[in-house]
Design a protein with these regions (language model features):
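Boundary at the C-terminal end of the N-terminal hydrophobic targeting segment
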Residues: 29-31
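N-terminal secretory signal peptides
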Residues: 1-6
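Long, histidine/aromatic-enriched segments associated with O2/redox biology
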Residues: 9, 13-23, 33-299
């Protein structure tokens, strides 16, 4: 093993075919199941599974998400490699709107697919995988863990709960149908139950077209005004080092408790002061348009 292993070398050793480091790349790796040659463009409501980067990171936001964090209970690298190879094959089928495996005609065994997405199209399903610092520790691969992948520092007013902290890997399923997203994660975990257990999961929704409008959160304020786009997005999101993570990215998932009942009793003026923006336009205090400069003296 060299000091600076290639992405391909890491993928071969670890068996992460469609998963990198929270979250890596979706390039085809040696030893991975080879998908059938594409003769036609992707079908309507279908986002290709393979690409220069994992889908689901800079992909236009879908309407629904199902996010899961799991703990490994195996340190057998070969078993984990087989699990990721299985997930690669399953994910390719799921993003095409297919079953994870064809149904068997044997009535005396459980169906190969749980079936709740039967007859539904892919609804732009994307599956994004990531691994955490403990993943490298459990598989005795610390020498491959990037230095930047470390535990977060304590933030003021943190009230972290152990049940929703840490974990070894994550699966993010995004789709324009909640049942499609849930079905995908359910079947991926079902096929890997000998190697992992679910630590926590979270469903979410978004009813705005993020390509043309900044979404609003449940406090009714625009959320994502400062998000990068275009070339700036590529510079900020994708890793460009000379190691195996080149083309991958990092992810932080934090559950935030929203006290809606208290918020609903808060005056509009105080709501504006809390965010430093006007609720209707999203403009900074003292301005008229959402993307005008912020005057911090007014907040």
């Amino acid at each position: 093993m060299t000091d600076a292993p290639s992405r391909r070398g890491f993928i071969k050793q670890c068996g992460i075919v469609s998963a990198g480091l929270v979250a890596g790349t979706a390039a085809k790796a040696e030893g991975a199941p080879c998908p059938p040659a594409a003769t036609n463009p992707p079908a309507h409501n279908e986002i290709p599974f393979y690409g220069s980067h994992q889908a689901g990171i800079t992909t236009p936001a879908q309407k629904h998400i199902y996010f899961l964090v799991a703990d490994l209970h195996s340190d057998d690298r070969e078993k984990i490699q087989e699990m990721f190879q299985m997930w690669t094959a399953y994910s390719l089928n799921l993003t095409r709107g297919e079953h994870v495996k064809p149904y068997s005609k044997n009535l005396y065994i459980p169906p190969t697919d749980t079936g709740e997405a039967d007859s539904l199209n892919p609804h732009n399903l994307t599956l994004t995988f990531g691994v955490s610092p403990s993943f490298f520790s459990k598989l005795k691969m610390e020498h491959l863990r990037p230095a930047e992948l470390a535990d977060l520092p304590h933030f003021p007013r943190d009230q972290l709960q152990a049940a929703y902290t840490d974990g070894d890997l994550c699966i993010q399923a995004c789709a324009d149908d909640p049942q499609v997203a849930f079905h995908a994660v359910r079947n991926l975990v079902r096929g890997a139950r000998l190697n992992l257990t679910m630590r926590w999961s979270q469903a979410g929704f978004n009813s705005y077209d993020s390509a043309s409008e900044t979404p609003r959160n449940l406090f009714a304020f625009k959320d994502g005004t400062a998000n990068f786009s275009g070339e700036n997005l590529d510079k900020v999101v994708w890793c460009d080092g000379d190691n195996w993570l080149n083309g991958g990215s990092y992810l932080i998932a934090r559950r935030i408790k929203m006290f809606l009942e208290t918020w609903d009793r808060t005056s509009l003026g105080e709501q504006h002061n809390t965010f430093g923006r006007y609720r209707d336009s999203g403009a900074p205090m003292g301005q008229h348009e959402e993307h005008e400069p912020i005057n911090l003296a007014l907040t």
